[in-house]
Amino acid sequence: MNIKIGSLLLLLIVSDISFAADDGIAYLQQEIKVKVEVLDEPCDIAPGDELINIDYGTIVDKYLYINTRTIGEKFKINLIDCDISISDRVAISFSGIENSKLPGMLSVIPMSGQGDVGIGIGFETESGEFIPLSDEKQYKLNEGDNSFTFNTFVQAEIDRLIARTIKLGEFESSAIFHLNYD
């Protein structure tokens, strides 16, 4: 799973529109004032955490038919050099292409490129609380380094469980994690 982050940028555009007449011809004059403020982020992402790969290894379909989902695979987002005078809170969220049959979960793409696999990937807190795509989880920042642990898991679609038609083979998916500072 590829997880990436972008930077913060605040853009404020103010437009003043006025009309002027010269020699009986009306001209539209537009003055655009642009103010850009680049915000200093309170934390840096630890080197190597910009791209996080998660390998589920081998998942036996019978396990999904019995348990509906896998045990969570842990991963961490490590923030370093945090300056809480800039912000002492961060909201973390995940985004990606949503599985239409498993709301709030990522869809997957079979490596063979053919068909629907019948599974999705979910995110949860370290304690097992489900985090739907685009939902933010708020965390308090400490001065210096901070580490946030999450789990991802594979879950089967209900109709595929009932029909016992989970597609076998390798799959992939990607998501983006977002850091929003208060």
Where are these regions (language model features)?
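Mature extracellular/passenger domains of Gram-negative fimbrial/pilin and adhesin proteins
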Residues: 2-3, 19-182
